[in-house]
Amino acid sequence: MAITDWPEGERPREKLRAAGAMALSDAELLAIFLRTGVAGKSAVDLARELLKRFSSLNGIFAASAEEICQVHGMGLSKFVQLQAIFEMSRRALLEQMQGRDVLTSPQAVRQYLSLRIGALPREVFIGIFLDAQHRVLAVEELFSGTLTQTSVYPREVVKCALRHNAAAMIFAHNHPSGVPEPSQADRALTEALKAALNLIDIRVLDHFVVAGNQLVSFSERGLI
């Protein structure tokens, strides 16, 4: 049944106007952006299928164009729409961090990192470059690797930090395995980065390991 044939109070757009966006399920919100379904499948049905296949909204946003287009009813146009939504969300969260001390807004940092790298199928390592007041200067993806290993070169990180005139840094990388527990290699890397950056008086404030919506902070664990 097409959404236009549903009772008015159950249609996602009308429901949002009446009760606000918080009242909608993930599938209903997604359906608003998808706009249309296909024969025999409403936009809500299509949204539910995407959520089932990719497990979460983050999983959908991290999926490639090829993976999205394998779902009947999805095409490049809808993939582009989803990527635009994702990028707007990332930029909105980045705006929340900019212009303020990130140490006083840890939730914004966590949300941003989870959205940016939490669902990626490959391991990536990013740096958040901060000024002396711990305000965000830039966020960069520094390195990427396979599902099990990332090659990170402290010398290259130092070059980036100097280019941004950073006074402090926060690092983050994801574990595609879904387990955010820091490994011995993660700890060794953090120590190497701390030592290299200490030579140019740049502090490492934290290193987050991200897996989906789960994050582990080195600082909170007393590992930094």
Curated annotation (Swiss-Prot):
PROSITE patterns: MPN, UPF0758. Zn(2+) binds at H173, H175, D186. One of its GO terms (molecular function) is metallopeptidase activity. Coiled coil: none annotated. GO terms for biological process: proteolysis. CDD domains: MPN_DUF2466. Keywords: Hydrolase, Metal-binding, Metalloprotease, Protease, Zinc. The keyword Protein biosynthesis does not apply. Residues 102-224 form the MPN domain. A motif (JAMM motif) lies at residues 173-186. Pfam families: RadC, UPF0758_N. It comes from the Bacteria. Belongs to the UPF0758 family. This is UPF0758 protein Mfla_0315. The lineage of its organism: Bacteria, Pseudomonadati, Pseudomonadota, Betaproteobacteria, Nitrosomonadales.
